[in-house]
Amino acid sequence: MMDFDERVPVGSNMYLPGCTYYVSGTDFSSLPPFLPQTPSSCPMTYSYSTSSLPQVQSVREVSFRDYAIDTSSKWHSRGNLPHCYATEDMVHRDCLSNPGTLGDMLSKNNSVLYHSNTNHASNMYGNVGRNGVLPQAFDQFFETTYGNVENQPTDHPVDRTASKAPPPAESGSDSCRGTDETERCEETSSPEPSSGNNEEKFSGSSNGQKTRKKRCPYTKYQIRELEREFFFSVYINKEKRLQLSRMLNLTDRQVKIWFQNRRMKEKKLNRDRLQYYTTNPLL
């Protein structure tokens, strides 16, 4: 097919719809030409009147229209085309026919394209709404959709600040958290008597609400010394209790309550051991 196309000259009387070349009539002299250019050579009858129909362009003009060939001297003018297509087609035709002045053409026709597009949009959709794309009839959907989105960022900072707000500081609780050294410092700075791990202290605030004081556990050093003393004697006398309280920087009441709790714990452990051995006779 390529060899046949290369040796056939361009611009003969016969048109092939699959390619842009023309075949001379001498090659096919015995066959009648198809797709004639004159409409009178192929009369056809229609069931409707053709006088009211708009004039249709020929096949040659439609096929060469997209290739930007200057056919003003051969073909009829396209004054009957729609206005929107004629404007855009002329702009693209000028750009393609003058490839060297592409930048100039874009700069010259920028305002023309802008105004023509706005005029076409105004004719098709009427007045454009606040969203810039849809008509004014869609403004109610635009406001309901994007109005909630715009109001959301104003609500989030309030929630974030409320969630990030620190809880009210409790009296004597700052020194109790942290390492063992900070706990020991708290015990030195608060010499008032307390009831150890199980003690609950209530401090009345300005609004009359009672809050529980945070528990201050014993340090490892204090527990080790108390366990050592408990190993020698389950019940501690007053002199030994005062000595331990001064050495461990605790109050007398704290040492006393610790021994009470430790005795209850030891009693529970003994009961659990007894139950374990009685339920397992093999041991």
From Swiss-Prot:
DNA-binding region: 211-270
Chain intervals with Low complexity compositional bias: 188-197
Keyword DNA-binding: yes
Segments of this protein annotated with the region Disordered: 147-215
GO cellular component terms listed in the entry, alphabetical order: nucleoplasm
Keywords: Developmental protein, DNA-binding, Homeobox, Nucleus, Transcription, Transcription regulation
Record SMART domains: HOX
UniProt cross-references to SUPFAM superfamilies, sorted A to Z: Homeodomain-like
Pfam families: DUF3528, Homeodomain
Gene3D superfamilies the record matches: Homeodomain-like
Function according to Swiss-Prot or TrEMBL: Sequence-specific transcription factor which is part of a developmental regulatory system that provides cells with specific positional identities on the anterior-posterior axis.
Designated name of the protein: Homeobox protein Hox-A11b
Gene name, Swiss-Prot/TrEMBL: hoxa11b
